[in-house]
Structure formats: structure tokens, C-alpha cells
Curated annotation (Swiss-Prot):
Similarity-based family: Belongs to the ligand-gated ion channel (TC 1.A.9) family. Acetylcholine receptor (TC 1.A.9.1) subfamily. Alpha-1/CHRNA1 sub-subfamily.
Keyword terms: Cell membrane, Congenital myasthenic syndrome, Disease variant, Disulfide bond, Glycoprotein, Ion channel, Ion transport, Ligand-gated ion channel, Membrane, Postsynaptic cell membrane, Receptor, Signal, Synapse, Transmembrane, Transmembrane helix, Transport
Broad class of where this protein is predominantly found: membrane
Domain of life, per lineage: Eukaryota
Protein location: Postsynaptic cell membrane; Cell membrane
Membrane topology, Cytoplasmic segments: 254-264, 318-427
Protein name: Acetylcholine receptor subunit alpha
Associated disorder: Multiple pterygium syndrome, lethal type: Multiple pterygia are found infrequently in children with arthrogryposis and in fetuses with fetal akinesia syndrome. In lethal multiple pterygium syndrome there is intrauterine growth retardation, multiple pterygia, and flexion contractures causing severe arthrogryposis and fetal akinesia. Subcutaneous edema can be severe, causing fetal hydrops with cystic hygroma and lung hypoplasia. Oligohydramnios and facial anomalies are frequent. The alpha subunit is the main focus for antibody binding in myasthenia gravis. Myasthenia gravis is characterized by sporadic muscular fatigability and weakness, occurring chiefly in muscles innervated by cranial nerves, and characteristically improved by cholinesterase-inhibiting drugs.
Length: 457
């Protein structure tokens, strides 16, 4: 294949590019020969520059609950017509649009009114698209840090209402009129956040007048966003562990008191919960404006564990009581031994023996029998001469002392068994009560908000 056709094609393309560049160069030179970027682009100074504003939300970067700052990545689309930048495409080789630096032309000085921490105005001056009709489109990117009142009452099942208020800084409505491109911001290129989802968004125009100049309107466009937090992270890492700690606390009452491990388990649960709370405390918004739901639940869990320790001490104290230190009141015996076990069907729990040693140790007569079992002499009364013998009398006194000692020991053992039985009944009752309180407390903290969110859809 001959190389000259390729050379010819390359030469024609190069000539076209040079010619096109020449047309654009002449056009730019002509447009900006006497152009001033500080003068409003109108034919008559009484005319109003109409600026159409559109907000494209790209990313929700951060929501700072403590400082109440929402950081977003946006593109601020602005369109207007510049009377001084029109041309006839036929005079410039058919060039209908060009890209020029935004610093060279007049621009509406739009700023974020509710700026919290950052630049009020746009700092990235990208190029604008200029058409032969004078229509200008400028879409600069910006990182906005806007103030938003963060209400953490329902955290982590919360919704936040935030807004971005845009307007010109120096121009009032009589010289520059701003209008929203749409009643909603553009979310077509929005990158989903792992923590927030935008449920609702809208935009509207405001016109405000002040007492100093009632005939002069000041315009702004406010974009409003309703953001709902995705709570899965907090459910898995905070709520479920706290719930498990609560259930583990209830199991303290399932552990037998005789094992001696009740207090060990209770203190271990408390220490584990304390370390856990120290680890996750940074996940909770540190604000004093309100106590979030998750903070209430963590407080409930801590009180729940401490209450179990206090009650465990009482149960252990009850278990180790004895007649020498405590006398069981009749109401305790009636409630915890006679009534509650029957009501709660504690049939498997062996009740303490309450038989009293009220038999007479001695009878009026003493029957003396032979060791071999053969009948002995007739019974002798207390007035028998043999009974009055000193050695026999001493033996009888010894037998009487032994019997009374055995009776006292038996009564002491029965009383101690009753206290242990009362402690066992208390354990069974508290096991059910604490498990029930754990479930009811969890539902009381979160159920109301979850039902409300479900009704909202």
C-alpha cells in the first residue's frame, strides 16, 4: 500500500484542527475584547438576570452528631444568559459552543447560607459551557459543610431533617433572580451510604423582605433532606451484646447457692459489661441535648446487672441464716414455704421437715427388761427406791441431757433448712422475674420507635 494516501489524510486532519482552533481563537478574542466580568450581563441595568439553580447530590460524606455538621459532596448547576457573549456560528466556522474558564466571566455569587465549617462560596472554578446564544452552563463541584440540628433522641433508629440554603451574597432579587431547576435535587448519581439512606428530598424558593428595605426581596433556594439511619451496625455490635449480658445476669439465679459461685458470676458479668461499654462509648453521640435510645438501654442494662448483684447478696444471706442469728417471722414461713410453692407448682422442691420433738422423754413408769429380752420385774414408778438411788438418778439425768441436746440440734437443723428453702424459692422467683424484666425492658425501650417507623413505611 502506498504511503501517500495516509499522509494526505493526516495533512487534511491537521489543517482542519488548525483551522478549527483558529476560529475558536478569533471567537474568544472577539468575545472578551471589551468584556468586564464585574458587570451584570444585561442590555439595560433595570433588567433582572435570571439564574436557574440545580443541586446534584453526589455523596453524603459524614454526619457529625456532636458538632451538628453534615458534610456532602455536591455539584451546583447554574444556568443564565450573558447578553455580551453571543455570536453567529457561520462567522466562526460553525463553532456553536466553547469551554472557557469561569474566572473570565460574570458569575452569580451563590453561597451556602447555613455553612457550618468550611468555605461559604464555591472554591473550585471549573470551566463553563458557553453556547452561541449566550446561554451559560456552569456545574462546579463543591464540598459543603452545612449546619443541621441533629436530634439523637431515637438513636440509632433516628431520622434527621437537614437542609442546604443557597442564595446570592451581594445581589438582591431586583437584580438577580434565582429559580430552582426542579422541586427536587438530582439524586441520579448519588452514591449510597453505608449508614444513611435518603427517604425524601425537595427544594423550594424563598423570598424574604426586611424592615430596612421592604420593597427589596432577597431570594434563596432551600433543599431539604430527610435522612434515615441504617441501624444494623448498632443492633449487631451494641444492642444484641447488651441483651445477652442481661440474660446472663438472669442466669445467676439459676445457679445453686451451695456452689459458692453466684457472686463470682455476678461480678464477672458486671466487669465484662463495664469493659464492653468503655469500648463502644465512642459509637454513641456524645451530646447533652437528649439521651438516645441506645444510651437508655445501656443504662437499663447496667442498673439491671447491679440490681442482680444486690439481690444475690440478699439471697446468699438468706441461705446461710441460722436460728442463732435470725428467727424466721411467721409471714416469711407462710409466704415462702406454705403459699408460693403451692401457687407456682414447686412440687419437685423438697420442703423442710417441721416435726417437733414434743414427745415426752420419760414416762411415769420405767419398764426394766432383761437384756436378753425376757420379761423383767414389774415396772417401777418414780417413787421406787431404785429410782432414788444416786447412780440411777445420775444416769437418768445424763439421758435427759442427751435427749434435750438432740432435740435442740434437730430444731436448729430444721430452722436452717427452712431458711435454705426460702432462699431456693427466692431464686426460682427471681429467675423468672429477671428474665421477664429483661424482655419487657428491651421492648419498652425500642418497641415504640420501631412501631412508629413501621407505620411511616
Amino acid at each position: 500500500m502506498e504511503p501517500w494516501p495516509l499522509l494526505l489524510l493526516f495533512s487534511l486532519c491537521s489543517a482542519g484542527l488548525v483551522l478549527g482552533s483558529e476560529h475558536e481563537t478569533r471567537l474568544v478574542a472577539k468575545l472578551f475584547k471589551d468584556y468586564s466580568s464585574v458587570v451584570r450581563p444585561v442590555e439595560d441595568h433595570r433588567q433582572v438576570v435570571e439564574v436557574t439553580v440545580g443541586l446534584q447530590l453526589i455523596q453524603l460524606i459524614n454526619v457529625d452528631e456532636v458538632n451538628q455538621i453534615v458534610t456532602t459532596n455536591v455539584r451546583l448547576k447554574q444556568q443564565w444568559v450573558d447578553y455580551n457573549l453571543k455570536w453567529n456560528p457561520d462567522d466562526y466556522g460553525g463553532v456553536k459552543k466553547i469551554h472557557i474558564p469561569s474566572e473570565k466571566i460574570w458569575r452569580p455569587d451563590l453561597v451556602l447560607y447555613n455553612n457550618a465549617d468550611g468555605d461559604f462560596a464555591i472554591v473550585k472554578f471549573t470551566k463553563v459551557l458557553l453556547q452561541y446564544t449566550g446561554h451559560i452552563t456552569w456545574t462546579p463541584p463543591a464540598i459543603f459543610k452545612s449546619y443541621c440540628e441533629i436530634i439523637v433522641t431515637h438513636f440509632p433508629f433516628d431520622e434527621q431533617n437537614c437542609s442546604m440554603k443557597l442564595g446570592t451574597w451581594t445581589y438582591d432579587g431586583s437584580v438577580v433572580a434565582i429559580n430552582p431547576e426542579s422541586d427536587q435535587p438530582d439524586l441520579s448519581n448519588f452514591m449510597e451510604s453505608g449508614e444513611w439512606v435518603i427517604k425524601e428530598s425537595r427544594g423550594w424558593k424563598h423570598s424574604v423582605t426586611y424592615s430596612c428595605c421592604p420593597d427589596t426581596p432577597y431570594l434563596d433556594i432551600t433543599y431539604h433532606f430527610v435522612m434515615q439511619r441504617l441501624p444494623l451496625y448498632f443492633i449487631v455490635n451494641v444492642i444484641i451484646p447488651c441483651l445477652l449480658f442481661s440474660f446472663l445476669t438472669g442466669l445467676v439465679f439459676y445457679l445453686p447457692t451451695d456452689s459458692g459461685e453466684k457472686m463470682t458470676l455476678s461480678i464477672s458479668v458486671l466487669l465484662s459489661l463495664t469493659v464492653f461499654l468503655l469500648v463502644i462509648v465512642e459509637l454513641i453521640p456524645s451530646t447533652s441535648s437528649a439521651v438516645p435510645l441506645i444510651g437508655k438501654y445501656m443504662l437499663f442494662t447496667m442498673v439491671f446487672v447491679i440490681a442482680s448483684i444486690i439481690i444475690t447478696v440478699i439471697v446468699i444471706n438468706t441461705h446461710h441464716r441460722s436460728p442463732s442469728t435470725h428467727v424466721m417471722p411467721n409471714w416469711v414461713r407462710k409466704v415462702f414455704i406454705d403459699t408460693i410453692p403451692n401457687i407456682m407448682f414447686f412440687s419437685t422442691m423438697k420442703r423442710p421437715s417441721r416435726e417437733k420433738q414434743d414427745k415426752k422423754i420419760f414416762t411415769e413408769d420405767i419398764d426394766i427388761s432383761d437384756i436378753s429380752g425376757k420379761p423383767g420385774p414389774p415396772p417401777m414408778g418414780f417413787h421406787s427406791p431404785l429410782i432414788k438411788h444416786p447412780e440411777v438418778k445420775s444416769a437418768i439425768e445424763g439421758i435427759k441431757y442427751i435427749a434435750e441436746t438432740m432435740k435442740s440440734d434437730q430444731e436448729s437443723n430444721n430452722a436452717a433448712a427452712e431458711w435454705k428453702y426460702v432462699a431456693m424459692v427466692m431464686d426460682h422467683i427471681l429467675l423468672g422475674v429477671f428474665m421477664l424484666v429483661c424482655i419487657i425492658g428491651t421492648l419498652a425501650v425500642f418497641a415504640g420507635r420501631l412501631i412508629e417507623l413501621n407505620q411511616q413505611g
